[in-house]
Structure formats: C-alpha cells, structure tokens
Design a protein with these regions (language model features):
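Short Gly/Pro-enriched turn/cap motifs at secondary-structure boundaries
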Residues: 203-207, 234-236, 284-287
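A short coil-to-beta-strand element that immediately follows conserved catalytic motifs
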Residues: 29, 170-175, 226-230, 272-277, ...
Length: 346
C-alpha cells in the first residue's frame, strides 16, 4: 500500500486529489495538510467527505511528512514547494508538485512571469514535466514531478500532433481558452463572487497570463522549433472545465483526412485522450469529473488555417487526475488505476 501525503488538501485541486485517492485501491492517505485548517476535521471543511475521512488537518512540515509517507503531493500556490524541497526530502519520498515551481526550465523566465524568486533552482533540471502522454518513460524513474498546468495540458494535447509533425507555423499559433471558476482557486476574491461571474464571460491575463511560457516551452520541445503564441484565457460561469480552440497557419498543403490520420496515430494508444469523430466538437460537459481529454481538428481550406480543439476537466486531467496518473507510473502501477471513472452527466 502506497502511503500518500497531501500539502494543500483543502484547496480545490487538493480536495480532488482526496476524492480520487479514496477510490484508489493501492493508496492510503496519511497526511491531510492545510495551512488554513490545522487541527480541524477534514470532513468539517468538505462535508462531502463526512464519514469518509476521519482525519484531522495537519500543517505543511515536509521534513516530518517525508518520514511517514512514500509520495507527497503539493497542491499549493507557486513558491511553496520550491521553498520546502531539499535533497534530504527527495532522498526519502517522491514529490508531485501541482504548482508551477518546476515546470519551466529557465529560472529567469519563471521569475519574470510569476514575479517571485525561485527558492531551489538546483532541482529544476532534474524535475520531469509530468505530461504522461509525452514523458511516460522519464516519469517512471523521477524523484520530482512537475505536474502540468490546466491550460497548458489542454492546449498542448490539442496542438501536439501537428506540432510534432511539423505541419504548422509555430509562430502563428493562437490559443483561445475558456475555464470554469474553480481554476481561479478557492481563495476569497471579489472578482470570483457569484454576482461578479454569473451571466458573464470575460477575458483575463491578456498577453500576460503565466501559463504562456509553459505552453510555448512544451510546444517548442515537441516541434523542434521556437514556439511563440498568443494565449488568451477567459473565465466562464461554470464550476469545472476547460475548452481550448487553437488556430495556426499550415506550412504544407494537406487534406483534412491527412490531418485526422496524424491525430489518430498520435493518440491511438492513449487511454485518456479521446480523438472525436469528424465534425464533432469537444464539449466540457462530456468530460466533467473525468481524466479524459476530448480533442478534434478541422481544416479551414479557405484561409489555409487549421483549428485544433480540446476539452477537459481542469481539476482532474488538469490537476489531480494527472497527478495520480503520474503517481501510478512512479510506482509501477497500471497508468489508469483509480482513474477510469466515466464523465459525469448531467
């Protein structure tokens, strides 16, 4: 039985980790970490865990935690994991970090976009970017996993097959993304109050969103070219879900059938990436509560541009589900263990 600890278990991503791991036959959660609810019953914070989780919330003492568990999930704001991780910790436990601390390989880029100083840059190179569909073999032997961001996961998986095939101009990519309000976290903010978001949709972080360099870096690796994108996220009045519609110029003449064959080949063996039938657009309602990503592609022959689409649950494949997928690989378990729950509808 794998013993797990969660730092940040009372945030939305942390609570989703708890929900998934409670149904995982090979895992026991030993530590429910929370800075805000120390010594309070976890089930008093999340009533859905009543009579399911008897544990009390603890602090974020990583040194103590690593003496009690095999794997630590850090579902915390940027800067915390990098301030806690050490060689001593990594010699004892596996770390799966859901923050951005170890996703971006260039420390100057991280500090510029996130506006904080990185506390442990010596571990950046070692950290493995935890997108299982691309880095599966590297993940299996890692000590430190950088769990990808929600927007980057959906954006990358929507674009990846054509980027890898060298069929799109990597400096022409435009990513239009929309997310439910849980993506903004559980902290109290006026901008996220019901009356502020209901019956409205807005763009935010225009030309400045912190996920931009992460998407660019991963697309650059995939294509072997420098990727420079326009990324514009939007907040929509729903709890969960991300919808990505991305556009790019083609560099070769191809048919839609040829584009579809590239996607089919890229994802035919991927359990959690569902390439939809021709003419079917991804929808967030068909992936809610699941670890699935639905993708599709459409050729605009008139403009010679390609439209790449994706939908997923930002809290599952965009955070907790992907973290569990990484954990399964780290411990030699079937990658799908604990993650085959079908999407919830309605």
């Amino acid at each position: 039985m794998i013993k797990a600890g969660i730092i940040g278990s009372t945030g939305y991503a942390g609570q989703e980790l708890v929900r998934i791991l409670l149904g995982h036959k090979d895992v026991e959660i030993k530590w429910y970490g929370s800075r805000s609810y120390i010594d309070q019953a976890y089930a008093s914070v999340f009533q859905n865990m009543f009579q399911l989780v008897p544990n009390i919330c603890k602090g974020e003492d990583l040194e103590q935690l690593c003496e009690e568990v095999d794997v630590v999930f850090t579902a915390t704001p940027q800067g915390l994991c990098s301030s806690l991780v050490s060689e001593n910790v990594l010699s004892k436990v596996k770390i799966i970090d859901l923050s951005a601390d170890f996703r971006i390989k260039d420390v100057d880029t991280y500090e510029k976009w996130y506006g904080i100083k990185h506390q442990s840059p010596q571990f950046i190179e070692e950290a493995v970017y935890g997108l299982c569909e691309v880095n599966r073999d590297k993940i299996k032997n890692a000590r430190l996993i950088a769990n990808p961001g929600c927007y980057p996961t959906c954006s990358f998986l929507s674009i990846y097959p054509l980027a890898k095939a060298g069929l799109i101009d990597m400096k022409s990519v435009i990513v239009d993304a929309k997310s439910g309000t849980s993506g903004a976290g559980r902290g109290a903010k006026v901008a996220n109050l019901y009356c502020e978001v209901n019956e409205s949709i807005k763009a935010y972080g225009v030309a400045t969103h912190r996920h931009t360099p992460e998407i660019e870096e991963q697309l650059s690796y995939a294509s072997g070219q420098e990727a420079v994108i326009n990324f514009t996220p939007h907040l929509v009045p729903m709890n969960r879900g991300i919808l990505v519609t991305a556009y790019a110029n083609l560099v070769k003449d191809v048919t839609e059938e040829e584009l579809r064959k590239i996607y089919e080949d890229a994802y035919k063996d991927e359990q959690f990436v569902r390439f939809l039938n021709a003419g079917v657009c991804p929808e967030t309602r068909w992936v809610e509560g699941s670890n699935y990503v639905d993708v599709n592609v459409k050729l605009d022959e008139r403009t010679h541009r390609v439209i790449m689409m994706g939908a997923m649950d930002n809290l599952v494949k965009g955070a907790a589900g992907q973290a569990v997928q990484n954990m399964n690989l780290l411990f030699g378990l079937p990658e799908t263990e604990g993650l085959l729950m079908p999407p919830v509808f309605p």
